[in-house]
């Protein structure tokens, strides 16, 4: 199991603290964010381990505890860029280029992930489910989403925007998952999710929040974990059958690619 680094060198890497000078020309908030990012032990570990982002360790830690990913399972990663979660899922499902078990989807271009093809399109496009099923060779056992809306600094607004992404991801998962499948998605603390929780509890046998050690202590970030999908006979998604008006292209962003003031990576 991956443990939270106690210090920057706990992963076997000798790291020197880096300080960004106040006269660097950056705004103070940007300077603080950059300094924290550079000195983050998960960022340093991700470089040493070959992961594209520190967010990879969030999925590793959640999977170590909750056992979502197993060899041969089919997985869809929504908003896959830059590819850290695809890397983890591909390794744990034993996905290969010849026999892919993991497919990512994102309208943002990204480098190819070995063993995990990525479709360059919006997952809300009408033909996305069919194209994903074709790429996987069937419906998924797991749907993942680490999407978050770029933050505005207004906590209530940020929560609502990211919750909307979580809701449309959940509706997508309900439309494609195999019975017994699992759904994992980023959300923020802050309420306004009773309808989503009610819908998930109606359609999955286990629903709860998780916060992996790789999520910063001060972050409002949480993950919704819904396990053991009951199947589509349990009832249609509530309130999510209609496509929102162009919100995903305005809001969707893999949080680990954001800069100062944005969601945690």
Swiss-Prot record:
The cellular component terms of Gene Ontology attached to this UniProt record, alphabetical and capped at eight, are: cytoplasm
Q: Can you list the disulfide-bonded cysteine pairs? A: none
Q: What is this protein called?
A: Ribosomal RNA large subunit methyltransferase E
Q: Where is the composition biased (Basic and acidic residues)?
A: 243-257
Any one GO molecular function term: rRNA (uridine-2'-O-)-methyltransferase activity
Species name: Mesorhizobium japonicum (strain LMG 29417 / CECT 9101 / MAFF 303099)
Q: Which family does it belong to?
A: Belongs to the class I-like SAM-binding methyltransferase superfamily. RNA methyltransferase RlmE family.
The entry's function note states: Specifically methylates the uridine in position 2552 of 23S rRNA at the 2'-O position of the ribose in the fully assembled 50S ribosomal subunit.
The entry's S-adenosyl-L-methionine-binding residues are: 83, 85, 106, 122, 146
Annotated signal peptide: none
List keywords of the entry alphabetically. Answer: Cytoplasm, Methyltransferase, rRNA processing, S-adenosyl-L-methionine, Transferase
Instruction: Give the matching InterPro entries.
Output: RNA_methyltr_RlmE (IPR050082), RNA_MeTrfase_FtsJ_dom (IPR002877), rRNA-MeTfrase_E (IPR015507), SAM-dependent_MTases_sf (IPR029063)
Q: What is its EC number?
A: 2.1.1.166
Region annotation (Disordered) ranges: 230-265
- Read off the Pfam families from this record: FtsJ (PF01728)
* HAMAP family with a match to the protein in the record: RNA_methyltr_E
Q: Where is the active site?
A: 186
Give the main EC class: transferase
Subcellular localization, as worded in the UniProt entry: Cytoplasm
Q: Which reaction does it catalyse?
A: uridine(2552) in 23S rRNA + S-adenosyl-L-methionine = 2'-O-methyluridine(2552) in 23S rRNA + S-adenosyl-L-homocysteine + H(+)
Identify the gene encoding this protein: rlmE
């Amino acid at each position: 199991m991956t443990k939270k680094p106690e210090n920057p060198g706990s992963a076997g890497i000798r790291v020197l603290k880096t300080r960004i000078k106040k006269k660097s020309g950056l705004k103070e908030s940007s300077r603080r964010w950059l300094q924290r990012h550079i000195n983050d032990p998960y960022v340093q570990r991700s470089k040493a381990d070959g992961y594209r982002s520190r967010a990879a360790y969030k999925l590793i830690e959640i999977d170590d505890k909750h056992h979502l990913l197993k060899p041969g399972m089919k997985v869809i990663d929504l908003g896959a860029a830059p590819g850290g979660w695809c890397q983890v899922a591909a390794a744990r499902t034993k996905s290969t280029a010849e026999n892919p078990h993991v497919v990512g989807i994102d309208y943002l271009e990204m480098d190819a992930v070995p063993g995990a093809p990525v479709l360059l399109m919006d997952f809300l496009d009408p033909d996305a489910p069919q194209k994903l099923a074709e790429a996987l060779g069937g419906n998924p056992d797991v749907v993942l989403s680490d999407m978050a809306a770029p933050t505005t600094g207004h906590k209530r607004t940020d929560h609502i925007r990211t919750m909307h992404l979580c809701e449309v991801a959940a509706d997508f998962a309900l439309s494609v998952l195999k019975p017994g499948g699992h759904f994992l998605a980023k959300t923020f603390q802050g309420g306004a999710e009773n309808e989503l929780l009610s819908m998930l509890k109606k359609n999955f046998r286990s629903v709860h929040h998780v916060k992996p050690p790789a999520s910063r202590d001060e972050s409002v970030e949480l993950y919704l974990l819904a396990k053991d999908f009951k199947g589509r006979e349990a009832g249609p998604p509530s309130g999510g059958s209609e496509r929102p008006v162009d919100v995903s292209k305005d809001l969707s962003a893999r949080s680990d690619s954001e800069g100062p003031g944005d969601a945690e990576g």
